[in-house]
Amino acid sequence: RIRKAMHGVPVETKLPDRAYRPEVSDRVYREMAWRADLILSEGGSVVADAVFDRPADHDRIEKAASDRGVTFAGFWLEADPLVLWQRVSERRGGPSDATVDILSRQLQRNATPPAWRKVDADRKLADIAAELASVSDAAAFAQRASLKTAS
């Protein structure tokens, strides 16, 4: 949604390829990290939903959390490539501009951030959400425990 806002269009509007050039993506991910830092500075929680397939991007979002002294829980959702291709090719409407060509390029990069938890996304949405919530709850508990120990 940040990219669409930067281009002044509604989220359902398909952007041209030039909107996905590396320098534009760099601005998008910097803005996302800046927003995350702002929210964390006010004591809020952040969910940053993006591809994060470039090391600079996932390093930047992790740094936003570490600079604020909060626990970071990064998740890398994976599914069988055939399932992903089917999902993308059947998608109609919505904010995503992804195509099967874009998906193919992303899969070739094989850019899983090393410290992020891999999550099998080839399951029911409820099962994925439950796994993410349990890990997030554990991270929040660890964060509270470390704050109590430090004080």
Predicted regions and their residues:
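Conserved nucleotide-binding/hydrolysis micro-motifs of P-loop NTPases
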Residues: 1-2, 52-53, 78-85, 123-125
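Conserved substrate/cofactor phosphate-moiety recognition/catalytic segment
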Residues: 1-44
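Conserved P-loop NTPase nucleotide-binding/switch module
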Residues: 52-53, 61-65
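Loop/turn-to-beta-strand initiation segments
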Residues: 42-46, 71-73
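Short, hinge-like loop/turn segments at secondary-structure boundaries
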Residues: 10-15, 65, 91-95
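Helical mechanochemical/support elements of P-loop NTPase systems and associated helical scaffolds
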Residues: 21-29, 57, 84, 99-103, ...
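Small-molecule kinase domains that catalyze NTP-dependent phosphoryl transfer to phosphate-bearing small molecules
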Residues: 90-151
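Conserved phosphate-donor/acceptor-positioning beta-strand/loop module used by diverse small-molecule
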Residues: 68-88
